[in-house]
Amino acid sequence: MFYKNNLLILLIIFMFTFFEKVDAKYEKLFFDHSINNINNETIDLNQYKGKTILLVNVASKCGFTKQYTGLQELYKKYKNRGFYVIGVPSNQFGGQEPGSNSEIKDFCETNFNITFPITDKTDVKGDDAHDLYKWAKKNYGNSTVPKWNFHKILINKDGKIQDTFNSFITPMSDKITKQIDLIL
């Protein structure tokens, strides 16, 4: 019994250490990167310097896909205050984003009237993850690595990670809107 309790305590300590938020010393900032948009044109993220960003990996055939509505609503609510949503389609979670960039763009515009920027389809975790997601993990830890579609990373005006939100936290939730209000 004593052994099991100690093992459990060690496991809990390991989990908190493994998943804790890192007080990062950034070598690079969010704005020091680029990513291709849905039309395969380079987006220099430096254009968002001084803005607040919600970076979200998205998918068209996921149970969380309805969150596109909340993301668009969030974008409309805060865009005049220097806030942007950037959607990053990825097919890494259950093959739920199988379409081409053209199909993804059409899906987003037709079904959700999306007006916020969408990138081209890219990997968001693992060795082949886009450099932006590798940067996030390096500087903020494992909480930035998406576990499923519609994982959210909030970037502050300084180009640093403010917070992360799992797929179950909806875009218009108090957890997200309070953080945005705090840093805008």
For each predicted feature, which ranges?
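Local sequence-structure signature of Cys/Sec-based thiol-disulfide redox active-site neighborhoods
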Residues: 49-54
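Thiol-/selenol-based redox modules, centered on thioredoxin-like
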Residues: 131-134, 138-184
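Bacterial N-terminal signal peptides that target proteins for export
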Residues: 1-9
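Amphipathic alpha-helical repeat scaffolds
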Residues: 37, 57-61
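N-terminal "domain-start" segment that seeds a small globular fold
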Residues: 22-46
